[in-house]
């Protein structure tokens, strides 16, 4: 797993793209809990999202799970590949399985996210 990722308690990951945008997806742990992903309900470009509120839905053979935005901002890109290949969320959650890119309203929100090493330690304790 990449060390530059940050996480939420609800198992979303965030990559700071360094240009005022972040890429968001669900963690390897989350996709493992969900099982085989069969559908991803993507947000729309230009949708406004609020930190902690649902903005996407991932359906698996076991369950449907809301995906919560880790940050407040505007959707600038969605991963349309997931419409035809939702299994990428399982196969490469941190690479081709990303869900959306968000233009940050407030970059200081990134400071409240969980560093990758702390996140991994919290999983070990479960």
UniProtKB/Swiss-Prot annotation:
Entry keywords, A to Z: Lipoyl
InterPro entries hit by this protein: 2-oxoA_DH_lipoyl-BS, Biotin_lipoyl, GCV_H, GCV_H/Fam206, GCV_H_sub, Single_hybrid_motif
Lipoyl-binding domain sequence ranges: 21-103
Cellular component annotations (GO), alphabetically ordered: cytosol; glycine cleavage complex
Keyword flag Metal-binding: no
Modified residue annotations for N6-lipoyllysine: 62
Any one GO biological process: glycine decarboxylation via glycine cleavage system
SUPFAM superfamilies (alphabetical): Single hybrid motif
Cofactor note: Binds 1 lipoyl cofactor covalently.
Keyword Disulfide bond attached: no
Cofactor(s) the protein requires to work: (R)-lipoate
Subunit structure: The glycine cleavage system is composed of four proteins: P, T, L and H.
Function noted in UniProt: The glycine cleavage system catalyzes the degradation of glycine. The H protein shuttles the methylamine group of glycine from the P protein to the T protein.
HAMAP family: GcvH (MF_00272)
Similarity remark: Belongs to the GcvH family.
Name this polypeptide is given: Glycine cleavage system H protein
